[in-house]
Every structure is written in C-alpha cells, then in structure tokens.
A protein has these predicted regions:
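Fe-S ferredoxin-like electron-transfer domains
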Residues: 1-2, 6-114, 120, 127-128, ...
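Iron-sulfur-associated redox domains of electron-transfer enzymes in respiratory
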Residues: 1-2, 6, 15, 130-237
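Flexible, glycine/proline-enriched loop segments at strand-loop-helix junctions
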Residues: 22-23, 59-67, 123, 161-166, ...
Length: 238
C-alpha cells in the first residue's frame, strides 16, 4: 500500500546519504539499515550518493565515519542524557546537518571519555569500537615474537554468555585452549592481580576512613571511568 511505499522511499533516501560499501563495513550483517532494506526489498537507489566522506580516527577507543551516519541521534542522546559527557552534538541545519563535536574538532580533543556507549547504540557503522584484530594476527604470524594474552576475571563467564551457554558458565579452560590453537604462546590470568588490587584498595579505604575527610572513595580499573573522573569531576580525582 501507500504506507509501504512511503517507508520504502524513506529507506531509499537514507541509503542515498549513506556509504553502501557493506562488504567491508564492521556492522555488515548486524546493521539496522541493512536489515530494513532487506525487509522492504530495497535493491536499488535512484538518487545520487551524497554521503559525507569524513573519518575521525583520532580517538584510541572509537572511529567515527560520517559517510555511514543516518542522523538518528541515538549517540547524541546516549552521550548527553545518559552518560552526561557531552562530547558529540548536532551541528548545522537542513541538508547540512551532521553529528559532530564542538567546533568540529577531532573527538580526541573533546571531553570524550572513551566509554564506547555511542558505538553500542549506533544502529549502523558510523561509530565503531577500534579493533586491533589485524595487529594481533600479524603478531601471531611473526615467528620471531612471543605472543602473550591476559584474561580479565569477567571474561571467563562473559564469553560463555556470548556463546549462549548457561548463565555463569566458566569457560576459562576452553578459552585458554582456543588461544593456544590460534597461536598465542602464553596465556595469563588476571585474577591474581585483581585479588592484590582488592587488598590494596581495602587498605586505602581503611586509611581514608581513619582520616575522616568527608569525601567519598571511588575506584575503578576502567579507563573510561577514570577519564570521566578526570574530565568531568576533576576535584574528586586524586
């Protein structure tokens, strides 16, 4: 019907302003726009491609590709309303509208904390988490290198959940075996270091409590959390 035609036209217009190189896109197979195009059987685009070809690769955490952005605004809401960071916003109006940073500076020069939540909610491949997979495979292939891996405590159950195993299944043995099969020489467990960290933090908390400073004590091993404290609440950071 006419409603179906309208939705098809909207998808076609979105694709006209979108990079259509799906084969090399990290979101290939998991892209909402790709799924909608398949659902509504949009096989051709009648309009010229006007996608903006700007890639911001300055951050150590994420990559922003303007040619894939559909201006849905989910990343803006996540960054401003949920994470309270405010690194990205809407810029300009009309056909010139885009999602950018203050003064359109590289994301590395903003208050971005590298939490990655914008990439988590992006329905297409406009914001993606940086991958070092190619570097890892290159290191494994180099016989002159000894390649080691370090596994965080939470990974032993998170991998199992990702593979649809029962909640809480410990797959550390399978994970180590798989890494050795890949060519990784040594695998280290971070659990011991985590235990030592807990002991140090407990001692620091007891000392902090004895001084009666009246200030809270926060601790985290997450780089994003630490950057958030440094950039947004610097008076609490020591």
């Amino acid at each position: 019907g006419s409603e179906m035609c309208k939705e098809t036209d909207i998808i076609e217009l979105l694709l006209a302003n979108h990079c259509r190189d799906c084969n090399t896109c990290e979101k290939n197979g998991n892209c909402k726009l790709q799924q909608l195009a398949k659902r509504y059987d949009v096989r051709t685009v009648r309009f010229p491609n006007t996608a903006k070809t700007y890639v911001d690769d300055s951050s150590v955490s994420i990559t922003r590709d303007a040619s894939k952005c559909i201006l849905c605004g989910q990343c803006v809401r996540m960054c401003n309303e949920i994470q309270s960071v405010g690194a990205i916003h809407y810029a300009h109006r009309g056909s010139h509208m885009l999602i950018s940073t203050a003064f359109e500076r590289p994301i590395a020069e903003t208050v971005c904390v590298g939490c990655g939540q914008c990439a988590a909610v992006c329905p297409v491949g406009a914001i993606t988490i940086k991958q070092d997979t190619a570097k890892v495979w290159k290191a494994i292939a180099d016989k002159n290198l000894v390649v080691t891996a370090q596994v965080a405590p939470a990974v032993r159950v998170a991998i199992g959940k990702e593979l649809n195993m029962p909640e809480g299944t410990d797959v550390m043995g399978k994970l180590v075996a798989a890494m050795h099969r890949m060519g990784i020489d040594k695998v280290y467990d971070t659990s011991v270091s985590a235990d030592l960290t807990i002991l140090e933090e407990t001692a620091e908390f007891v000392e902090h409590l004895g001084k009666n400073t009246g200030m809270p004590l926060f601790t985290s091993c997450c780089p994003g959390w630490i950057q958030f404290a440094e950039k947004k609440h610097c008076l609490l950071y020591t």
